């Protein structure tokens, strides 16, 4: 699947001028509120006409302003999941799901009803009414309804934004299964770096209506400038589960040339995982420290130092091929005489396993 988007649109004082190309998987639009994420996904969906630009899916021109082409939203065969589930309150879960089948061409019904309800874990909900569902359950049903329409592309506009942390934790594993077990490309809108780090293959960073960066999630989310909130800056690494210590509930994850020990549930050896290390949780030392409770200490070489905010600096460290970010005070940087090329030891206080 190849999706090409070029869009210009003026909305009052706000101006959107964005372009990107996606080759499938999960492409995440990431940025602060008001950055243009929803405006852009609405143009892709056919819910809004751009003032200029084009939307092309696998060579088919869905929008091209110079040629006067605009395929209506109902003919694009895109699934759309909103912040709110928007289920029909008078229909059961089963009937809501069946409604999605009305929009699937008979020749294109690639996903069976049973497979979808198993994928989303909604077998026990089929006879309930939407009023008797939790927020997370409603969103899973809404996703199922969209999938049963056999979409060529699934658009998800902040589907977890209205949920509390417990409901988000409930639904994220199902979104991972959706990503891994179907071939449906997804455009996913979020301002949560944790969601994007866990789900996305490609990231498009938007700011003030313009694309600031685009590329693989591991590369983009490891840049200090990518975080919508400075507190969220950090490194995203890919690794493989080496082993699981049942006694201490620790997984050993092998990176390119290093290993990390991470508190986790039982993980199968050989499983690929993503690891997020917030820059605020990485301390630096110029000699290998001893007598610390920290389990993860990596040796590396400083690649770059950039000024941060409020008297801080962001330091990028190459740890045998894995890039780690550390945010420390400018005073600490001066006292340790830190500079590019110097060897340091990164003391990692917190590691988040992103799935």
Curated annotation (Swiss-Prot):
Gene3D superfamilies, per database record: 2.40.50.100, P-loop containing nucleotide triphosphate hydrolases
Gene Ontology cellular component terms for the protein in this record: plasma membrane
GO molecular function: ABC-type molybdate transporter activity; ATP binding; ATP hydrolysis activity
Domain ABC transporter: 1-233
Record keywords, A-Z: ATP-binding, Cell inner membrane, Cell membrane, Membrane, Molybdenum, Nucleotide-binding, Translocase, Transport
Chain's role: Part of the ABC transporter complex ModABC involved in molybdenum import. Responsible for energy coupling to the transport system.
Family, similarity comment: Belongs to the ABC transporter superfamily. Molybdate importer (TC 3.A.1.8) family.
Binding partners and assembly: The complex is composed of two ATP-binding proteins (ModC), two transmembrane proteins (ModB) and a solute-binding protein (ModA).
Name of the protein this chain belongs to: Molybdenum import ATP-binding protein ModC
Organism: Rhizobium etli (strain ATCC 51251 / DSM 11541 / JCM 21823 / NBRC 15573 / CFN 42)
Gene name tied to this protein: modC
């Amino acid at each position: 699947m190849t999706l090409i988007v070029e869009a210009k649109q003026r909305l009052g004082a706000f101006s959107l001028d964005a372009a990107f190309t996606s080759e499938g998987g999960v492409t995440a639009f990431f940025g602060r509120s008001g950055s243009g994420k929803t405006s852009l996904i609405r143009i892709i969906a056919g819910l809004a006409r751009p003032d200029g630009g084009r939307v092309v899916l696998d060579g088919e021109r869905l929008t091209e302003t110079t040629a006067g082409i605009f395929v209506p939203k109902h003919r694009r065969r895109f699934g759309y999941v909103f912040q709110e589930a928007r289920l029909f309150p008078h229909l059961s879960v089963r009937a809501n799901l069946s409604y999605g089948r009305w929009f699937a061409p008979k020749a294109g019904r690639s996903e069976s009803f049973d497979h979808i309800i198993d994928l989303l874990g909604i077998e026990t909900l089929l006879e309930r009414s939407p009023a008797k569902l939790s927020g997370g359950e409603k969103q899973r049903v809404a996703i199922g309804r969209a999938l049963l329409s056999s979409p060529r592309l699934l658009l998800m506009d902040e589907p977890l934004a209205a949920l509390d942390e417990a409901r988000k934790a409930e639904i994220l594993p199902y979104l991972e299964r959706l990503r891994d077990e179907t071939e449906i490309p997804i455009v996913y809108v979020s301002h949560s770096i944790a969601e994007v780090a866990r789900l996305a293959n490609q990231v498009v960073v938007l700011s003030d209506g313009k694309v600031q960066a685009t590329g693989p999630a591991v590369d983009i989310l490891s840049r200090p400038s990518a975080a919508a909130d400075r507190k969220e800056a950090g490194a995203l690494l890919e690794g493989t589960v080496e082993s699981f210590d049942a006694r201490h509930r620790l997984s050993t994850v092998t990176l390119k040339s290093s290993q990390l020990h991470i508190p986790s549930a039982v993980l199968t050896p050989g499983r690929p995982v993503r690891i997020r290390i917030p820059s605020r949780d990485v301390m630096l030392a110029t000699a290998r420290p001893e007598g610390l409770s920290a389990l993860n200490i990596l040796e590396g070489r400083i690649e770059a130092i950039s000024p941060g905010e409020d008297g801080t600096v962001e330091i990028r460290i190459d740890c045998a091929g894995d890039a780690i970010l550390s945010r420390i005070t400018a005073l600490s940087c001066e006292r340790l005489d830190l500079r590019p090329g110097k060897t340091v030891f990164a003391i990692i206080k917190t590691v988040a396993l992103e799935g």
